[in-house]
Amino acid sequence: MRITAVDVTVVNVPLSVPFSSSVGTRVTTTRTVVRIKTDEGLEGIGETFRGRPTAHIIQTLSPEIIGVDPLNIESLLYKFKMVPFFYGYVGFAALAGIEMACWDLLGKASNQPLAVLLGGYVRREIAVSALVFKKPEHCGMQGKELARALAGDGKALVESQKVKVLKLKGSHDPEQDVLNMEALEEALQGTVKLRVDPNAAWTVADTLRMLPRLQKLNMDYLEDPVEGLDALARIRQEAHMPLATNMSVVKPDDVPAAFRLGAVDVILADVHKWGGISPTRKLAATCEFLGLSMSMHSGSELGISTAAHLHVAAATRIIDHAMDTTLTLQESDIIDEPLHDVRGGVLPVPGGPGLGVTINEEKLRYHAAQNERDGDAA
């Protein structure tokens, strides 16, 4: 089998509600869709992030991909191992989109789901968390009023999706964030595990001041309160709860450094930010060897990427925390199979060959036109 064409499409898909965090507010998701065609008539699909810059890198690499056997995934990754060195995160994103499409091709060629190719199923359904964040209707609220409103949102999510874990998107105001967490705990009477993710917007001093209150709650983990492994290690010395990160462990040599410092307990993996499914599995093996835990980060994936994360979680034993997903916030998608319907706190792993999902051509064209008109979302 040989690659004959590499097509790249950038899409904008609106969110059903503006999504706010300490980083800012988004109303649209921009994603990059990769389609790899072969001389045997099979097509593999992939998805990644960073829109047009990522698409440009993939298009630049495409001439070197034509004629390559897409089933030799490890060789392909080695061929382009310097891409992240020159392009950073966007380079990882480009490789991830290409590699994901190759895994999809391998599954279709062998008529096997991706999870089987990764070693088989550890689990058939993946526990997911639900996201609580400040919405437009909360504008002007603060203090206990905002905390009560967010607690109401969290309770509604638990009742509708039956999730066992809630994640609060934090802010630059740790006092308000912890007040919100306490309101969630009270509303749910400790029946649901909680996470808070300020995206490193807190200071070390603020975090240390908030720890005694957070430690009274049913915490799943505290995610990226501060930036950098040294700062996280300082927090970890005082924290009687797991610390998680996707912002301070971003490349392979960060993992042993985090281990030596005792900085974190849970590494949040992301196939797009680690350069593909194979590198993510290598990360899992490293974490397991070092005694670290692991879960899956969410960065506004659509259905193709969500399917990839579900398969990775299905085949990776060490992933022992509920997976984050923002697919439930999307107004639409670009695949035929609806993956966003969380029931019983879980998402099923797609069962077809490869990723187990198919592109809806009409939706792809529609959302590509939105990107052509508006450009990449911020």
Enumerate the predicted regions with their spans.
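Conserved, mostly hydrophobic/aromatic
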Residues: 3, 34, 41, 61, ...
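C-terminal extensions of enzymes
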Residues: 329-378
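Metal-dependent enolase-superfamily TIM-barrel catalytic cores that perform enediolate-based chemistry
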Residues: 119-239
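Metal- or metallocofactor-binding catalytic centers and their adjacent structured scaffolds
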Residues: 36-110
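Structured beta-strand/loop patches that form or line metal/cofactor-binding pockets in enzymes
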Residues: 1-45, 328-334
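Hydrophobic faces of well-ordered beta-strands that scaffold small-molecule active sites
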Residues: 44, 126-130, 164-168, 194-198, ...
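Predominant activation on well-ordered alpha-helical scaffold segments within soluble catalytic domains
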Residues: 55-62, 95, 99, 103-104, ...
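Shared catalytic-loop signature of beta/alpha-barrel
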Residues: 56, 68, 212, 218, ...
